[in-house]
Regions:
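Residues that cap or anchor secondary-structure elements
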Residues: 1-209
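Flexible, small-residue-rich N-terminal segments that precede or flank a structured functional core
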Residues: 201-257
């Protein structure tokens, strides 16, 4: 079973297996997130983060207002959240651990003149490259095997209106010794449009490419939307969801499907 429940210990918030850690408070080096598995390590910090900003664990298991059926269908401890309120002026930063993915939400609460967010990434035994699809691949330094993917970012406002994928992009700079500068850029005109409803969520996730499942949801205004690390699929009169798996486990005839 996957247990992504979080606990506080000393200056850290971490999963039980300690593979994923968050800073309880932003200190001098500004480290926010550490992912450590086997001989691979990823450390991320947000440039300009307001010092002494604290991270709070958001309880996913309480599910206030959920129906009995929703609670029954929710896998306990599969996901967990950490929120850094006002880590930048008018910006919250939220991390959601879901299954094997770490979803990062930059929550923009008010208009600004610039929507570029810079992260410093320190890698151990990994190399980073921005590929032709606009996603970032983190590969083993020796074998070249892709260990993690940072898919292309998405952005949506409080009304659920998504930005066209052409309005968001990454830039990646190798500064040496395993350190990289990652910038998440969102089009200013789209963000400042009178049609926007705040807050706006900018979503650059980190995922482990281990799943045999591919899913996609599109509508007429978001025909090229792609968010492979998003755990949800929109289905409605205007949204169409598609789901594909390349392999299925053996299911005996006597099995009950619940």
């Amino acid at each position: 079973d996957i247990d992504n429940s979080l606990t506080e210990s000393g200056s850290e918030i971490s999963t039980k297996n300690a593979k994923i850690k968050f800073a309880k408070k932003i200190t001098g080096n500004g480290t926010l997130l550490t992912i450590h598995e086997s001989n691979h390590k990823i450390t991320m910090s947000l440039d300009g983060a307001i010092k002494k900003t604290t991270g709070s664990i958001i309880d996913n298991n309480s599910m206030d207002g959920s129906t009995k059926l929703q609670k029954m269908l929710t896998l306990e401890n599969l996901s967990a959240r950490v929120l850094y309120k006002d880590i930048l002026d008018g910006v919250d930063l939220e991390y959601i651990i879901n299954s094997y993915d770490v979803k990062e939400n930059i929550i923009v609460k008010k208009k600004s003149t610039n929507y570029s967010y810079t992260f410093t990434i320190q890698l151990n035994n990994l190399n980073a490259v921005l590929d032709e699809k606009g996603q970032i691949l983190l590969s083993d330094a020796s074998s070249g095997t892709v260990e993690y993917i940072i898919p292309t970012p998405t952005a949506y406002d409080a009304d659920g209106v998504y930005a066209d994928s052409s309005l968001l992009c990454y830039s990646l700079s190798d500064t040496g010794n395993g350190k990289y500068t990652l910038r998440v850029n969102v089009d200013t005109d789209w963000m400042n449009s009178d049609d926007r409803a705040y807050p706006i969520v900018i979503d650059p996730p980190i995922s482990v490419p281990i799943s045999s499942v591919t899913d996609l949801d599109i509508n007429s205004t978001n025909a090229d939307r792609s968010s492979p690390a998003d755990p949800s699929i929109f289905v409605s009169s205007t949204w169409h969801g598609y789901w594909k798996t390349s392999s299925l486990p053996y299911i005996p005839e006597s099995a009950y499907i619940t």
